[in-house]
Amino acid sequence: GDQQSLAICGRLVPEVVAPPPPPLYVRLPRLLRQAWAILRPAPRIRRMEELLALGAIPRESTGLESWRAVDARMPDLFEAYQLHLVVSSGAGALTPILLGQLAGDAEPSDEHHAIVASVLSGAKNVESADIAEGAERILHGLLAAADRSASFVDRGATEARTWLESENAGEVGVLYRAYMSKHGHRSLRELDIRQPEWAHDPTPLIRSLQTQLRGRLSSTDAERSAAVVNTSPPEGAARFDRIRKFAHIAVRNRERCKSLLVGLTTIFKRAYRALGDQLVAEGRLSDADSIYFLFHEEIETLAAAPPGHALRDEALARREALAYQETLRFP
């Protein structure tokens, strides 16, 4: 119970009570399998690369046939999630273990969390870290071209995208296109099938670049210098120097695996978008977005039924319910 609380919440949750542990002969094989999986992530990462290499899900001649193409690949997505969880368990297990070492039986303090964060951070060649670093390179390119940066912040998202994707953007365009080639499958809420990836809709990314650039253009050199973050490790972090290398390897594996999972999820995003458009064209959906408010099995029912099935209106009602739920605020 305490280990789960620390791993998920970062603190002890008194209401979480661990069930009685199973006998040792049951636990020991589980522990050995878990340790073996943590120590050998490479085969699982290769397997995820193989799943991603299978490529796009084809759009067939009818909505029902397209649904079947998606359904045939669904086991790949389930397997990828399972592989990701196993590979990520190495990095995930470190946090509660280190917090337990620091805090003992007491509640971990902010200082303890800072020490653990310091041990896990700083790994080189972490794929997700380049999301922020790559955006920083684009910002530096814009700042280096003062005539372009001033106009970029005032462009609409569509106009800004067109400019970044054109040769007129010069070096900034090269940086942006390289960034999208590497990270175009990512987004906020990137494992949400309804959330478009940046390659499909880079508006959130462009808005973020514009906001950051606007702030830097309006700040002084002194303000930018004052914003530099202190990266020196907190006191007490040195005691974990021996395991830092292992921690960084675990973080790299986790983030590589997550990127592969997001890439595979993006294949399904594109397939569902195409299927939504197809069902609209067949008169089975009111709009393509409403496909995200049906269960996968319900989409088959809708695609097989004549136009006008009740699930068409059910999807719209569920979307309205979500819109209402998003207005709720809890104290």
Language model segments and positions:
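Contiguous hydrophobic, helix-prone segments at protein termini
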Residues: G1-P331
